[in-house]
Amino acid sequence: MSNPAKPDDSVGPQTQLGWLNGYRSAVSLTFDDGMDCHLDPVIPILEDHNLRGTFYPVAKGNWSETETSLPYLERFRPAVENGHEIGNHSIHHWCSCAARLDLESSDVSNHTPAGLEYRTLAELETELDQACQRFEAIFPEITLWSFCYPCYNTFVGRGTSRYSYVPLVAGRFFAARGGGEMSNLTNSPYHADLHCLMSWKCENRKADDLIELIQRTNRDGGGWNIFTFHGVGGGHLSIEQAEFEALCHYLQREKDTVWMAPLVEVALQLHQWRQQGN
């Protein structure tokens, strides 16, 4: 999943609003894990409000290079055809196991635990390459891909053997979304790492809370808020459907002030603005 024109993170001093073409801020709504609720009710709600989202399903299931079928991904084809973004969320969805109080069973042949603490960069490299093969086989028309770090984790190993796998992602994808450890997770057009973008977790949040984040960014001018959803109206890490609908209603109402677009589209515009020497 190569991208010959990869983002350059260097920018110079100029008004932040320049990259937004007159909007006060940008917003991307992202949805992790390819849940059933993303197909219904999320996509119909988005389309009822003339909004487009970014969906990160996992390329799980049996597959070989001679096959071009993977039902878990193919069910998102109508979303792609309607202008939504589909991004890569890996195959095995490896996460940190640091909080587990039992011995996690292995899912690899060397019988080590499955958490990122026990993975290597070589294993992540293979995981990313194989995931790229699967996504590209199912959606060959997509030329610009983004990646979503499972569980927001961007590392492998522990202690002196702990390494970031962000560089591996940067070599394969145009942009990538993580989480963030700061109190303010709005992405700056000057400083944001397009291969480790920060995002706001939305589980158990109220629409008013998320709207206030957008309004605060509008007052400051020029930032990019990325919201991460899992369950909507049910499922794990869920937000109530009514709260999600209220957020979508706000974004539709503020369409002349807030640029709401899929993650890879916002990343591309920011990249192009930076390439102009801004």
Protein language model regions, located:
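Short hydrophobic/aromatic-rich motifs at helix boundaries and adjacent loops
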Residues: 11-16, 103-106, 182-186, 219-222
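Short, surface-exposed linear patches
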Residues: 50-53, 59, 108-109, 170-172, ...
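Catalytic grooves of carbohydrate-active enzymes
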Residues: 157-158, 198-265, 269
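Catalytic domains of cell-wall/extracellular-matrix polysaccharide-remodeling enzymes
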Residues: 41, 63-71, 95-103, 110-205, ...
